């Protein structure tokens, strides 16, 4: 049985989940956290689903050996591929993150929203279910964004390469009238 002072594990395929960790620390200042990034195998977005499930499972078990009382999958791709599987296998809470379709659909003024994610996320049954549950009559322009995560992981936020990728991925969303 986990103790109150046991840490909450947080995992991502890379460093992007640090923003999730920051938010968790702000919301739960009395909690301890362990962060694990799989930088050796990042990005996961174009990897086979079986690879993503096994990497996620391995990291979760590592965090369990460190006494994690819960695990946050701070990665859309890991959530889409492995969250339901891990919830069936483990007795601790497995908390995933997903593209913010529900709040975006509720707040849109144009009736059009855009989602940029990894190919594995955009093709997942979990994401398609999310759209069915929360998009309603809102048009969702979904764009798989290969190469963008690699730029983020390198800290390459303002290079010509990153700007070209962003233009490529944001243009169909903008052209569709998304707000």
Regions found by a protein language model. Name each.
Residues 1-179:
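Non-catalytic structural scaffold of enzyme domains
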